[in-house]
């Protein structure tokens, strides 16, 4: 090299050629010896100082996971017989079962009924099925199978027909997120979209009367009216399918705040 390995001289020479020999501001000298000594060496792993990220969802208070009375008895049975106990799901299922049994029998001073709509969200293979199974077992053992609604609903009119025959019905729908996506699909027929609409209407009509659809042929297709329908929904789903299925339309329609 022209400067006999003198890097400072080389830099000054290059600066003169580029017209930047004199800096606009003073620059303090930098000791590069430590950097050159460590060149080529493997860096030591840095100590982890950041705290583990915390969930933004608060833990459920223990008091809410151990209710009293019949709800608590059902919760304890669900947990005691489960391979993967899920207290939150057990409470949700027990509430829906008791809400069904009490359907059209009790009301608050403001007219509220027991037509609950609860969605249990848990990861895949987290044991969502067990609580639904216990609900069915209890209703079957108590000879109350008439309360059990279908696990799939083909159309809005199918929902109306079921509730007209059994005004108190418990619908337990697995993969509820996929169900929402299916009924919202633009390629789905109007009979699918009517399912959610009828859930909303029957929820609101629990304190009065649900008035069905008027058809042109009143003789063969009369209007179906249902006094105080008690439609209880217990859906289970995974976060991956449920949250993408929610949108502003559910807020605008009022369906989201009914869950």
Give the positions of each predicted feature.
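Short, small/acidic-rich helices and loops at N termini and domain boundaries
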Residues: 1-47
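Phosphate-handling catalytic cores of nucleic-acid transaction enzymes
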Residues: 30-258
């Amino acid at each position: 090299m022209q400067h006999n390995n003198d890097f400072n001289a080389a830099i000054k020479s290059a600066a003169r050629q580029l017209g930047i020999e004199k800096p606009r501001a003073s620059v303090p000298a930098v000791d590069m010896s430590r950097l050159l000594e460590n060149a080529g060496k493997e860096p030591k792993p840095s100590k982890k100082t950041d705290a583990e990220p915390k969930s933004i969802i608060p833990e459920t208070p223990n008091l809410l996971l151990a209710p009293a009375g019949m709800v608590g008895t059902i919760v304890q049975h669900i947990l005691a017989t489960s391979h993967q106990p899920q207290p939150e799901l057990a409470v949700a299922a027990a509430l829906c079962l008791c809400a069904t049994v009490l359907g059209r029998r009790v009301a608050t001073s403001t007219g509220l009924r027991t037509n609950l709509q609860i969605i249990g969200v848990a990861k895949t293979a987290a044991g969502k099925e067990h609580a639904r199974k216990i609900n069915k077992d209890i209703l079957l053992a108590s000879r109350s199978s008439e309360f059990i609604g279908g696990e799939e609903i083909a159309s809005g009119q199918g929902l109306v027909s079921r509730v007209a025959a059994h005004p108190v019905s418990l619908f337990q729908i697995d993969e509820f997120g996929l169900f929402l996506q299916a009924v919202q699909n633009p390629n789905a027929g109007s009979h699918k979209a009517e399912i959610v609409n009828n859930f909303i209407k029957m929820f609101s009509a629990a304190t009065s009367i649900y008035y069905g659809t008027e058809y042109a042929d009143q003789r063969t297709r009369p209007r179906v009216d249902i006094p105080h329908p008690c439609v209880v929904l217990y859906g289970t789903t995974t976060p991956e399918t449920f949250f993408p299925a929610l949108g502003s339309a559910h807020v605008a329609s009022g369906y989201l705040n009914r869950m």
